[in-house]
């Protein structure tokens, strides 16, 4: 894999979009201007809850990609990709006559944006096609790789997404170069607009590193050391060529992508077995990135004025490194060369720090990218980390003597890399999916549930008669289901992991209260399962929430059935990676008025972020907050935002009382971030509320929604809309039935 990032074309040191205010005037909307954002830069951004609208999808709402992709002749697809690999094009010649290493890097950098902290990034939607990723310094020259694949995409059309093709091409490239990959799953569906909801960092310049505080503490959830890089700076921290310091950055950033030390070492060693980097000349001769490039370049950026600008004259990262004498073949030569030499610091023709063998060792032993010339092997600072860091060194030294262990470790680490954001196994499609499952895949056993409609009705009665209250049942079902995050399709009620560690111990889940509810629900399950019919614990948690919502609706005068789809399985503690699942723990849950310690942004912003991870629309966000308040589902039974005198009843009282101008809101004397609502006429205290509650009256867009649900004719509509949104969250992880 080639590793690129310009030091970087100084001619393009600013993000290509620049400042939206030019020449003292606001830009036109078609120029990227957003007047509201300029006037009120901290305004809540509800647009992220309206992303990927059906109108933007040229394939139409009825197109079923999961069905279409499974009609592909995968053997023919392999042959078509293999043909592209060695069909060198004059406009961008293949290094060593093979585009394979370039495609590996393309796939790596598509998948490698994933971070486990919030599940965002990754290859799952083909985002490498769009800004900012298509113009990140670390993705220099990958625009060519995607264009080289266009004939394949053109042939297969809508049956093969760019998201799948980008990753498949890199995976199959290794198969053609003598490496046995672990497997491959299709199922990544393209999106048609850039992701505007991913926080890539605070910097305004490429390669900025304002994300650090203190003694190099990296801001969460970021998983790269500088703006525009995938992981680390290959020259070393901020260009400091110190392999041991670089190892610290490597461990931090790869760890934030859920990779352990062995997986990290395998990816670096295995990936750098292939290809080269590009730094043949002065990086100042490199033109603007794709988003800033002239119209006539048709989306191809980084045009170089050095020599021919391609082949042996190519400039990408500014590093000019060829690792091995067999750059298009899988073998153990990377480690043999890494350990077979002592290394001295040098600079590439572009002025970037890299390493070469001391005393002219291994001269003329590796091929040039083009022609018959020879040169010496080189290494990146981060490559030397694999030898000189004590932990990585112990691992790679073992692989030097046991290359078969490296091959196995790399195959599984690569498979994890390119599938980490694909979600549960029910989303893995195609004939190349391996039968073996791995711990990070959040395995869920087949459900034992076999209930019919009459059984469901009887179970609802039993749950409501168990002594559990509406707030207990609602909050427990919510805690289970709302652990889902749509970014990487992890979490949710399926698996019943609400009763397992780490979820059972999360502060937001109120462990003591939760343990009591679980004990009672398990008793109901045990009693019911003593007969011929069975229900899983995961299903029972969701069913209990449904029963409670139905009761609350009846108490409000509405006979509403909450749809329930059985079929959830129960995972075991042994099937649950505690460390990996710990990243799903919410730091805030505005739906239950929970705010953990150390929040970096105010609670109302955290609410929008959580709604986004749940794939909710603004109206769904509104009805869920309003409904959960009146149902009494708050954290620790708090009265904040419970704007009703009939809690436990599914009414629109939250909105009615929130927009009532007869109430005056002031900050609480306790100075704890809460507010007190008093009667304007009498001064009597009426309510208490949080920032999350008041934002539905203060923010103009959210108030517009609140007013709809506060109207006299909205009571039944509110109840029905709440149920629809509730079911959406309850079933968010049910990819097995949709």
From Swiss-Prot:
Site, as annotated: Transition state stabilizer: 105
Processing and modification events after translation: Formation of the three residue Trp-Tyr-Met cross-link is important for the catalase, but not the peroxidase activity of the enzyme.
Gene Ontology biological process terms in this record: cellular response to hydrogen peroxide; hydrogen peroxide catabolic process
Covalent cross-link site, Tryptophyl-tyrosyl-methioninium (Tyr-Met) (with W-108): 231-257
Keywords assigned: Heme, Hydrogen peroxide, Iron, Metal-binding, Oxidoreductase, Peroxidase
Enzyme class label: oxidoreductase
SUPFAM superfamilies: Heme-dependent peroxidases (SSF48113)
Reactions this protein catalyses: H2O2 + AH2 = A + 2 H2O; 2 H2O2 = O2 + 2 H2O
Single GO MF annotation: catalase activity
Cofactor note: Binds 1 heme b (iron(II)-protoporphyrin IX) group per dimer.
Keyword Heme: yes
Top-level lineage group: Bacteria
List of residues binding heme b: 272
Pfam families, sorted: peroxidase
Residue ranges of the region described as Disordered: 1-24
Subunit structure, as described in the record: Homodimer or homotetramer.
Protein's job: Bifunctional enzyme with both catalase and broad-spectrum peroxidase activity.
Protein's UniProt name: Catalase-peroxidase
Species name: Mycobacteroides abscessus (strain ATCC 19977 / DSM 44196 / CCUG 20993 / CIP 104536 / JCM 13569 / NCTC 13031 / TMC 1543 / L948)
Lineage: Bacteria, Bacillati, Actinomycetota, Actinomycetes, Mycobacteriales
